[in-house]
Amino acid sequence: MITQTIKEWRGVKGLVAAEVLTDDNGTDGYTTGTPFDIAGVAELSRTRDVTNEAHYYNDIPAVVISGESPDTVTVSVSAIPLDVFAKITGQTYDNATGMLIEGQRTPKYFAIGYITENTAGEEVYVWRLKGMFNIPDQDNSTIDDGTDANGQELIYTGVETAHKFTKTGKGARAINVETAKDLVDTANFFATVQTPDTITPKVAYTITIVQGESTNGFVTKGGEFVTNATPIYKDETLLIHPYNSARTSMVYSVGGAAIETRNQAGNTTFSYTVRGDTTITFYDVQ
């Protein structure tokens, strides 16, 4: 019998954008600017029309021709700050006066990033790699005794990059990373635009915990106990608890370089950032 878990999409947050600076297969390749916040996001939908049409030969449907439209991403957001509005719509903003100048614009391509979530609380981190924003409408109304207020609706038309990525040999429209599988490091996912070539699997390192004759020190990660069977990853933080009833020394080594830290109190916690295979040794001090 097949066991199936039913989930629905419920949650979206963290909408950011970054200008696409270059997109080619030459020296520059695919490059972008630094991501910036757009506005709070209430709802996001993506649509893509796919058309399949059969062509007839020898009195039978012999060939199917398939075509795809650009992606249309519709985003309901809070009021967009005027400087951000100018940036994403290709208009002018004067920082010295706080003035948006509406007029002839210079449209630019942007990548957008955001986080979606399902009803199981599992997040998907997304970067859409190339597209252009419309100029969103703005509705303003008088303040009355009600609670009505207006956000804005952005429409982002997404296309495929001209740049062909090494991983696939093709361009890409977007990447979607399931964080629940814990296969990649997503700590800095939105610090820069991610592509098929920048996403790589986590490299698991080993940890060896050695106890002294009467020590009972322990190691935790994210509030969970770490054992010799626990995989550890680069840049993760381990908390080392070298505790026993007497004074204890703690030694940890990485790549054969031993470092000793003396714990005179017997119960001080040390933090350690993983850099490679790690050995943590607890031993008694007379």
Each language-model region and where it sits:
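Mixed-charge, glycine-accented linear interaction segment located at domain edges/termini
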Residues: 131, 135-202
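Extracellular modular ligand-binding repeats in secreted and cell-surface proteins
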Residues: 220-247, 274-276
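Polar/acidic, low-complexity leader/linker segments enriched in S/T/G and N/D
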Residues: 1-45
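Conserved "repeat-terminator" motif of extracellular CCP/Sushi domains
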Residues: 204-211, 242, 264-286
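Short helix-loop boundary/capping segments
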Residues: 103-142
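Short, solvent-exposed loop/edge segments of extracellular or virion-exposed proteins
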Residues: 206-227
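Oligomerization/assembly interface segments of phage tail-like spikes and tubes
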Residues: 60-85, 148-161
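Surface-exposed interfaces of beta-sheet-rich extracellular modules
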Residues: 236-265
